[in-house]
């Protein structure tokens, strides 16, 4: 059963234990300047603010339709339009990989460490320039760097914070152990440490329930799930095929691998009278550990459709049915391992 509550349910939540308030949906910008042109990207961002979505996520390497960094440049042009746009947004971006652009010499990381102090400082300065802003609200490590010492990494982020160039530090794609280590090492040095973790999390991939979610809860991190629709697998893909939608080879393989589950899932969504994408997002929003799933609309229409997930509450019986279709890992560690 699905209970429809109100017609506008974008809510603000704290980012973990921290005081900043962010919308319970995060606007992902990976498609901007690639699958979505600049005009439509601007319209999506304007509409997001109208709807109450104030949390925007990007990365320094986004822009695969042209050059890496193009998405940050696009956001910078949108901020430059004024009208309070920058002040209205809690802006998150990421650092880790070299950003390849034609006008730059190839970026050489002589020590091979992608979270070296040199790389973090250089990455922040370049992102600030592209984004046309003086600060990044949430600066995230895009991946773990197991070679660079935490002393160097944490001090680099702390220095940026002291300079007013970043406000909060986040992680992405970290294991529970990595989160715990980062938070412990930051605490030893009197640094604020991590404020959030961005992980892949959806009905068909619940691995982070073992250790990442417990680590986020213990250390007070906000959780920002990416790929909430499993790249489209949870977005009504089988119905789409019937309607003539063309699929990539990768998606065909995913369907073949998970067809039984997806058939049951789409049938359940039909009985509930909601789209599969709505149910997938609503399932994440029902988890108190989740701060804001990242949505990646390619059109304003898709953005508006995403809002429906915030307007419904899934009943306990529906949650149990979803668990039966997509069983989790068996609980949190070490409970999932021991008996």
What kind of region is each of these model predictions?
Residues 2-90, 162:
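N-terminal binding-site loop/beta-alpha segment at the start of enzyme catalytic domains
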Residues 16-32, 92-111, 135, 140:
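N-terminal small/glycine-rich loop or linker at the start of catalytic domains
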Residues 36-48, 115-130, 179-183:
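Short, acidic/polar
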Residues 79-86, 128-132, 161, 183-189:
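Acidic (Asp/Glu)-rich catalytic clusters
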Residues 128-148:
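Active-site groove signature of glycoside hydrolases
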Residues 144-324, 329, 339:
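Beta/alpha (TIM)-barrel catalytic core signal, keyed to glycine-rich beta->alpha loops juxtaposed to Asp/Glu
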